């Protein structure tokens, strides 16, 4: 059995009697250097510090035989090692004794409800994944450099006015809180930030919308416009944890909206134009999502992570591209393709006649001034073919 004991910055004094008893009866305890240093002299077990990288050492543990003990920060099941151990060895072989999490302590200090505060871990993730367009979050830092790195990104993406509080050594005798704005932390960060810190962010300006307008994206005109983007995402029907291939991605707007739709949704964007690839990366960072940006399709398909769903937004008439997309799609996966030219419409109509699926045509109008009145200006019609691979 592997027993995981959560411990806070207050060390042994903050533990329950059950947790203290487990540590005192242990023969071997694994943990980080900082966590092991929190144990007092009543704990006589041999102490093993995790190496870097840690995962190979964790995989080498054996839950058979004598009990193994692990110390972890706060609640080990909240972005902690407890989840990894259960995934590797099964819940029957792992017992978790949680402590109060840093998230709970931070929310208490800020006066925020835990249940409606987003939790983001930057322990291993890149800082741009914590960029948001509104709301509030507790961000778990990787180290002392994380607050400034996140503050710089927020400022670069127009979020410099965000309320930005760094809370250090939560629950311990050296606890400290420093309030400011993202812009202030980006321009003049303190030099003595503790390694053990979390960030409480209230994102400003608050521009949360279900569907971001076209002007929220960097693009050169190659973008699936807002009304069609909504219809396209409905046809793609994202589900949690699925991966999208956005082929002929243009601005990457479909990939970005896909990643925002459900937890765990990821995207790979294929785009031949270098400037557009830069736009995709910028848009992904601006919306706080991760999009794997690659080159021309289908040449860049080979070493990309396999898709659950494919959107073909450009290159429908490119010889062999539609067939390559269908070949890469797993059984049961959806492919959705949009067309605006007569030639690309013909290609989709031919695919529909061969493979079935659903063929739709969308036409929408925008109301615009017409003299002293209002008239309807037609937008380019869009033909859409969707099919499920059998």
UniProtKB/Swiss-Prot annotation:
<dbReference type="GO" id="GO:0008276">
    <property type="term" value="F:protein methyltransferase activity"/>
</dbReference>
<dbReference type="InterPro" id="IPR050714">
    <property type="entry name" value="Cobalamin_biosynth_MTase"/>
</dbReference>
<dbReference type="InterPro" id="IPR014008">
    <property type="entry name" value="Cbl_synth_MTase_CbiT"/>
</dbReference>
<keyword id="KW-0169">Cobalamin biosynthesis</keyword>
<keyword id="KW-0949">S-adenosyl-L-methionine</keyword>
<dbReference type="InterPro" id="IPR012818">
    <property type="entry name" value="CbiE"/>
</dbReference>
<dbReference type="InterPro" id="IPR000878">
    <property type="entry name" value="4pyrrol_Mease"/>
</dbReference>
<dbReference type="GO" id="GO:0046025">
    <property type="term" value="F:precorrin-6Y C5,15-methyltransferase (decarboxylating) activity"/>
</dbReference>
<dbReference type="Pfam" id="PF00590">
    <property type="entry name" value="TP_methylase"/>
</dbReference>
<keyword id="KW-0808">Transferase</keyword>
<comment type="similarity">
    <text>Belongs to the precorrin methyltransferase family.</text>
</comment>
<dbReference type="InterPro" id="IPR029063">
    <property type="entry name" value="SAM-dependent_MTases_sf"/>
</dbReference>
<dbReference type="InterPro" id="IPR014777">
    <property type="entry name" value="4pyrrole_Mease_sub1"/>
</dbReference>
<dbReference type="GO" id="GO:0009236">
    <property type="term" value="P:cobalamin biosynthetic process"/>
</dbReference>
<dbReference type="InterPro" id="IPR006365">
    <property type="entry name" value="Cbl_synth_CobL"/>
</dbReference>
<dbReference type="InterPro" id="IPR035996">
    <property type="entry name" value="4pyrrol_Methylase_sf"/>
</dbReference>
<comment type="pathway">
    <text>Cofactor biosynthesis; adenosylcobalamin biosynthesis; cob(II)yrinate a,c-diamide from precorrin-2 (aerobic route): step 7/10.</text>
</comment>
<keyword id="KW-0489">Methyltransferase</keyword>
<dbReference type="GO" id="GO:0032259">
    <property type="term" value="P:methylation"/>
</dbReference>
<protein>
    <recommendedName>
        <fullName>Precorrin-6Y C(5,15)-methyltransferase [decarboxylating]</fullName>
        <ecNumber>2.1.1.132</ecNumber>
    </recommendedName>
</protein>
């Amino acid at each position: 059995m592997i027993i995981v004991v959560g411990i806070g910055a207050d060390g042994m004094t903050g533990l329950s009697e059950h947790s203290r008893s487990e540590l005192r009866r242990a023969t071997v305890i694994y943990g980080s250097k900082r966590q092991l240093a929190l144990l007092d002299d009543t704990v006589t077990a041999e102490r093993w510090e995790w190496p870097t990288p840690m995962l190979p050492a964790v995989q080498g543990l054996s839950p058979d035989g004598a009990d193994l003990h692990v110390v972890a920060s706060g609640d080990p099941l909240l972005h902690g090692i407890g989840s990894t151990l259960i995934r590797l060895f099964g819940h029957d072989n792992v017992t978790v004794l949680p402590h109060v999490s840093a998230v709970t302590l931070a929310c208490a200090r800020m006066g925020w409800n835990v249940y409606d505060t987003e939790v983001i871990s930057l322990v291993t993730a890149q800082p741009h994944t914590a960029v948001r367009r509104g709301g509030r979050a507790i961000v778990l830092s990787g180290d002392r450099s994380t607050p400034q790195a996140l503050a710089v990104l927020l400022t670069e993406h127009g979020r410099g006015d965000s309320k930005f509080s760094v809370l250090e050594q939560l629950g311990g005798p050296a606890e400290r809180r420093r309030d400011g704005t993202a812009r202030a932390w980006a321009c003049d960060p303190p030099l003595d930030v503790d390694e053990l810190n979390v960030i409480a962010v209230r994102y400003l300006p608050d521009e949360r919308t279900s569907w971001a307008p076209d002007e929220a994206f960097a693009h050169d005109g190659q973008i699936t416009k807002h009304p069609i983007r909504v219809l396209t995402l409905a046809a793609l029907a994202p589900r949690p944890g699925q991966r999208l291939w956005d082929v002929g991605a243009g601005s990457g707007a479909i990939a970005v909206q896909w990643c925002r739709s459900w937890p765990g949704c990821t995207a790979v964007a294929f785009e031949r134009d270098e400037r557009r690839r830069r736009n995709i990366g910028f848009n992904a960072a601006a919306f706080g999502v991760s999009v794997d940006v690659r080159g021309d399709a289908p040449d860049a398909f080979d070493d990309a992570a396999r898709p659950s769903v494919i959107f073909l937004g450009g290159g429908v008439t490119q010889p062999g591209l539609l067939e390559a997309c269908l070949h890469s799609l797993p059984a049961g996966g959806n492919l959705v393709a949009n067309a605006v030219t007569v030639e690309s419409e013909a290609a989709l109509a031919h695919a529909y006649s061969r493979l079935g699926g659903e063929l739709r045509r969308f036409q929408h109008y925008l109301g615009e001034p017409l003299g002293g009145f209002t008239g309807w200006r037609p937008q380019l019609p869009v033909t859409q073919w969707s099919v499920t691979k059998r």
